[in-house]
Amino acid sequence: MKILVIDDEPVVLNSCRKVLEEDGFDVYLVPSADKALKAMKRGGIDLLLVDVKMPKHDGIYLMQKVKEQWPDVPIIVMSGYPTPDTITDGDKMGAAAFIAKPFTPDELLETIRQVIKKEVYHGKK
């Protein structure tokens, strides 16, 4: 499974890469919404981990663009600012799950497993 991680914080990107690669996932890292859209156009991405707060275009903007072109790709929203509005915005845009930063490796993996299980159950993957 190929996971695209989008976050403007290198520490978060590298931490996610380490955890996910150790668990057998193929991981691609990008620091912005624009680069994420370019990566999506190349194809083959199965799941996105998207930070909400990023410069230029935020995660909600990215989710909107992804859902327009790739509606079946599940998106997990990450945020260091888990307000009710952030969660509601993610839900409105079709987020498969939400995870608050900082998160543990186990929390990240469990969230991803739950999303994969839900996608398989609903016949999307």
Describe these PLM feature segments.
Residues 13, 55, 83:
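The feature encodes the CheY-like receiver
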Residues 61, 82-97, 110:
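Alpha4 helix (beta4-alpha4-beta5 surface) of REC/receiver domains from two-component response regulators
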Residues 9, 52-53:
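The short loop immediately C-terminal to the conserved phospho-acceptor aspartate in CheY-like receiver
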Residues 38, 60-71:
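Short amphipathic alpha-helix used as the core "switch/output" element in two-component signaling
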Residues 31-32, 58-62:
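Acidic catalytic/metal-coordinating carboxylates
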Residues 43-49:
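Active-site beta3 strand of CheY-like receiver
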Residues 10-28:
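Two-component/phosphorelay signaling modules centered on CheY-like receiver
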